[in-house]
A protein has these predicted regions:
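Structured mid-to-C-terminal alpha-helical surface segments
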Residues: 1-45, 55-67, 71-309
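Glycine-rich beta-strand-to-loop/alpha-helix junction loops that act as flexible
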Residues: 47-51
Length: 309
């Protein structure tokens, strides 16, 4: 169980150099994840996004602000049965942990998004957003089961997490689609620390997630999109989750990332054809991947098939 006491939060904040209220938020994120993974829902959910990257693969260079999960039950029928049960489970369990469900919640066939409010140790109101995607339930690479061990929080309970290559592939797709400051920071960490060695697989994962997201055509997108992130965006959306001592040079980072993206996204002819056919409502994963196990896993990917409608 995560120690959420004010004394522990202050101590960890002082040791790590992060803002105290945001340290408490990360501890609460971890506490919720730990609780979920101590129940029958552990085998039905996998963690993804920036929280997965920073809690499990990068020793928390920045703090996380939400929980992004994929449901991984296989059949549509199983998903339909589990969706309402999981929603009720989250509401009931977090209410018992003194969280209240915000009216900002959104419920769709493909996604449940809930904002849970709480009062922190300093007496300030804050919230944690939890999103569960039900159409990304098939994955390119095998899911990892990993322990939580960071400078801010540790747990003996293991958590299902996407493979690092797939995580960063989806993060790259997010960068090209929405280009938020935290996406820039996470991808810069990928490039700077050489976290993924298989660049071909990384590119293919990014292409796949870009296509199923439907946000921007990777054959046409320009790295100039990074220029749209301003110093004001960095100050408001990124710096509060960094260590107080960390410096972030926007122009230098964007310049390096542009070169990295240019090299990474030199698509092969087959990769270009996959994108063209996907945009023409033809799903041909064999143009992107050759591995039979990967093709078997994503042959009936619900989101990819939904995009074909």
């Amino acid at each position: 169980m995560i120690n959420l006491s004010q004394k522990n939060v202050v101590q960890v904040a002082n040791l790590t150099g992060f803002i105290k209220d945001n340290v408490e938020k990360v501890m609460r994120l971890a506490d919720i994840l730990e609780f979920i993974c101590s129940t029958q829902w552990k085998d039905k959910l996998v963690l993804k996004g920036g929280t997965a990257i920073n809690l499990f693969y990068r020793q928390l260079p920045r703090l996380s602000v939400d929980i992004d999960l994929d449901y991984i039950g296989q059949s549509k029928e199983e998903m339909g049965e589990d969706k309402e049960r999981l929603w009720e489970f989250l509401q009931t369990s977090l209410y018992q942990k003194n969280y209240s469900l915000s009216p900002k919640r959104k419920r769709y066939f493909a996604l449940d998004s809930a904002v849970f409010q709480y009062v922190n140790n300093a007496g300030n109101r804050d919230n944690i957003k939890i999103e569960i995607n039900y159409l990304d339930r098939n994955h390119i690479l095998p899911i990892k089961e990993m322990p939580l061990a960071t400078p801010v929080v540790q747990s003996d309970i293991t958590i299902n997490v996407l493979d690092v290559c797939e995580l960063y592939g989806s993060k790259l797709a997010a960068l090209l689609g929405r280009c938020k400051p935290r996406d820039i920071y996470d991808v810069y960490g990928l490039e700077k620390d050489n976290i993924v060695s298989d660049m071909d697989m990384l590119r293919k994962c990014a292409i796949f997630y870009n296509c199923i997201a439907g946000e921007a055509n990777i054959n046409e997108v320009s790295s100039d999109i990074l220029d749209g992130v301003t110093e004001r965006d960095i100050n408001r959306q990124l710096k509060p989750v960094l260590k107080k001592s960390e410096k972030f040079n926007r122009s230098e980072v964007i310049s390096e990332l542009k070169e990295y993206l240019k090299e990474l996204f030199a698509l092969t002819e087959k990769e270009k054809l996959f994108v063209e056919k996907f945009n023409a409502k033809q799903y041909c994963p064999e143009l992107l991947f050759e591995d039979e196990q990967i093709l078997s896993r994503i042959a009936h990917h619900p989101m990819a098939l939904w995009r074909m409608r």
